[in-house]
């Protein structure tokens, strides 16, 4: 006899929809408290199974990964945006594309990007005047977009900034788990869907312009865009310009908003924890003095590393993963039907007191070698894990640390909101603009 996981019951359509849509974060937490590590529920007619124990998560992402695909829930939501790009593609096609793109994220390449990252950060910060209030999350989103455009696609974002303005946020909002329409098709003409359509059109225009300009260029830089264009132009492959568009959209959307959030949450956490901030500043003074940070400095900055790691624990930019079982599976003692949508919430696991003492406190000091050695593998997984782990993990971590270090060397950030609150969009968005006053140090 099959044993389904426990979970909240209710009318089949409304099911758990209302409470979840009202507040996905506390609903996830409540389910974990009431029903345990594996919880089944029905949201807008779809079976969701939340899995929140590191051992089960490891089975899904690593040991049994061949039985869990990216799934129809994610494809319905994101298929339009990222198409057959790396995030959603599967099987042999995914494997070949991953191998093709991976070298762009190797250590030697990253070293070349580091200087551009610091240069772009300085240029952005030069626009800030001491004493003014800025919207930190938007500033950092523009910055990471500019960094990505320059390092991976060799173009200057200023040419396209107008078209890009708010694109990522609009697209991320379309996925907001707190809106009933997220569970409905994107073609239904709600105002949010219309904004989303416009953002998508802008994104496509920019991407196709960039491809065209690069093809017309005589001496192309040796970057991710060059690698992708060479693959499409290679008669041995049957890749098309559409594949190219999908990979570019995937990298842009997967890579800049997440990194901007990691930076936002690190800087706001430090601004609210003066002791932790003082330790990071003292370390930067000692190791860097007035010099710009370089990639070789990073291993000498353990406090900065812990500050970022802890911010990504407390506020994981990708706050939940989704997978779909492609055959009936057993998770722990429960049966999970074929086609169930699994939700694997970093939000719950990173705040679980079984793994993290005082889980809601920002405590960078917890990240000692002994603590890390004692932590179950999948109690902390801001970049996912297994074969589908984030291809941009090293890039994103390096970028976050270089940007945070460069900004702290120049400014003090005074957080202007009473609290941070969050929206469960595609990524963990701040619910309100993050206003901070910047003062030159
Ligand atoms: C620093 C912040 C970042 C975070 C928190 C983050 C998080 C993640 C997570 C959780 C996944 C797995 C998604 C899933 O399996 O459903 C992922 C995948 C991915 N990320 Fe990131 N990411 C970050 C930065 C980046 C950067 C900088 C890039 C590109 C430059 C990038 C590109 C991608 C791509 C292409 C995938 C799909 C990989 C595949 O399935 O083969 N990410 N990321």
Features from the language model and the residues they span:
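N-terminal membrane-proximal hinge/A-helix region immediately C-terminal to the signal-anchor transmembrane segment
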Residues: 1-96, 111-124, 143, 155-159, ...
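Cytochrome P450 I-helix active-site segment
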Residues: 5-10, 114, 118, 219-226, ...
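Conserved cytochrome P450 K-helix E-x-x-R motif and the immediately C-terminal K′/meander segment
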Residues: 17-36, 291-332
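Cytochrome P450 heme-thiolate monooxygenase catalytic core
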Residues: 70-75, 93-94, 109-261
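Short, small-residue alpha-helix embedded
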Residues: 258-271, 403
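Cytochrome P450 heme-binding "Cys pocket" and the immediately downstream C-terminal segment
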Residues: 274-276, 373-375, 393-429
